[in-house]
Amino acid sequence: MLIAQVCDFGNDGDARYRVHDPSRALGGLPGVTAVDCHFLSRFLPELIERADVLVLQFVMDWEMTGVCLRRRAAGKVTVFEANDYFFDLQPWNPIAGPWQDPAVQELYLQLLKLADGVQTSTPELARRWKRLGARNVAVFPNQLTSVPELSPAPQDRPLTIGWAGSPGHLADLYHLAPCLQGWLDAHPDVHLAVMTTEAARPFFNLPPDHYHFETFGSLDSYLQFLRRLDIGLAPLLPTDYNRCRSDVKFLEYASQGVVGIFADLEPYRESVGYKKTGLLYRDSPDLIAHLEGLRTDRDLRLALRQQGHAYVRRNRVLSNHIASRLSWYQGLLPKHDSNSSLPAEIAAHAVRDGGYLRLPPQEPERGLRDVMSTSAPAQASPALARLLEQSPQYLSALQHQGRLLNDLRQHRQALEVLERSRAIQPQSARTLAEIGRAWYRLNDDARALAALDHAITFNPHYLPAWQYLLRMLSVNQDADGPRRAEEAAKIFPTCYPVALLSVAAYPRERAPSIILEVLDRFGSSLDSNSRPAALSAFREAVLATVKAIPDSPELLPLLARASELFPESPRLVAAYGAALIAAGRDREGWEQHRRALALFRGATVAQDEFQNERTTPLPWELASHILKAGGE
């Protein structure tokens, strides 16, 4: 069996536990070849066609929706790995930007439904994914590849408590910092060690020789850090994101002989045996009581240390569980005798370890990645042209070059490049959508419509093609616009950008009632993370409608609802005030204008105080997050 995984390459915990370690273990099973392939690899199209099982690791590529459909028709299996609850990300988290993009969230919702199977890390995540329409959900908990022998408990150092975590978990530590600081002040014989991002260093004020701090690094450096600890903390605020996290910190602590005190939430309730393999706490006093008990009872520390290590070594080693993953894959396949072979060219370029192969970014992929990080098309396109001279069949590079040339309004050249792409993969919705865009810019609506229709026929779930099509139909006031808008709404029912884009496809006089319906449908689901982008999109749609049909009687209820849902927008509030005044409700209108003035003055003060700063101060974000979660 050929199993290919589309992924990025990393050396942190997630990369090891969820991506590379399982692939390596699968490749060690008889009759299995497992390949980790970078998402920009020039060999990916071939692997997509050949692999019996294709695993998608949070890839932000709408083309993968069509891959699911195409592979199912060919009797092959596509699995979506979804091991984080991406609807509740912390705003300061480095990955918050892309994951909070409504288009990315919609992509993941589509993949949950379109994939033949969804694999995840916890029962809580599996429950949520099933509720969102996922089929055949399997839980594969994180496992360790090995557990070292338990070394003797250190006796020649001060008792050390500690924590290590990624930036996304800063609030989990921050909300406990005051009570921990007080306990540490009361026990100067106890030391603290922390490993995370530099922003957390000031959370504690301790003498330098009592406080070890280091910035986060690789998984190996993290495991080395854990050997400093006697007691490890695992705080979690009761957020949706945290409830869906795995118990991997218990595995890491126990494997290194660290006694853990864990938040009494879903990730740890099943795996941590209370007072057998670790301790669970419900609030700050509970945590402090456990710390005090472990500080004064060395025998308890040693017992938990030994029992936790023994449990993990006996029950949580990957080699003892990997066969169940293979069995699940086999059960998804229409027939069990699938045995696709790996092309010789791919094998020759891969880094091989028995049945496990790695295709990390090589020279062409690194070149494309650099080009994609260049914001100016005028600089990126010539660099990509040079890369394509060396790798003329590199599909992702050809497609990106076609898009860049369209951005530069060099549409004839774009078509030449995109036709080369189509020759390699005729059913690529990405290629066809860019061809449609080029023809539209060349004023050939018939060819543009044909290309976009082909893209949607081959892959009805390719959102960018729908966006191009709806814009084109709206600009042309095409009579078919409303029908296509309704079709898009059925495919993307939870995507407000599609709903707003569809408004212009209808007759202009219907816009207020349609936007009002969209506001009612989506307004209650917006949280603090999604509001900024939603406010911008809805404000633009509402104010464009006010400008287009200023005398419509339906504007007043629309503006009332918009300013109710987005009371922080001075422009929406001001527009509502103007509409009230126009309707003869002067005093109510003046009240709204007074509100708008206060909002404007507040924004002016903030702009004056913060000048060019675009990042919210971290303590503010952490405090807001803690209070929202119900932290103490």
Q: What are the language-model segments listed below?
A:
Residues 113-149:
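Donor nucleotide-sugar binding/catalytic pocket of nucleotide-sugar-dependent glycosyltransferases
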Residues 5, 10-29, 143-149, 154-227, ...:
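Conserved catalytic-core segment of nucleotide-activated headgroup transferases in glycan assembly
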Residues 299-330, 334-336, 494:
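A charged, aromatic-enriched C-terminal amphipathic alpha-helix characteristic of glycosyltransferases
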Residues 274-285, 293-298:
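Conserved acidic donor-binding segment of nucleotide-sugar-dependent glycosyltransferases
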Residues 86, 98-118:
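Membrane-proximal helix-turn-helix segments that form the acceptor-binding/catalytic region
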Residues 168-171, 219-220, 224-255, 261-272:
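Nucleotide-sugar-dependent
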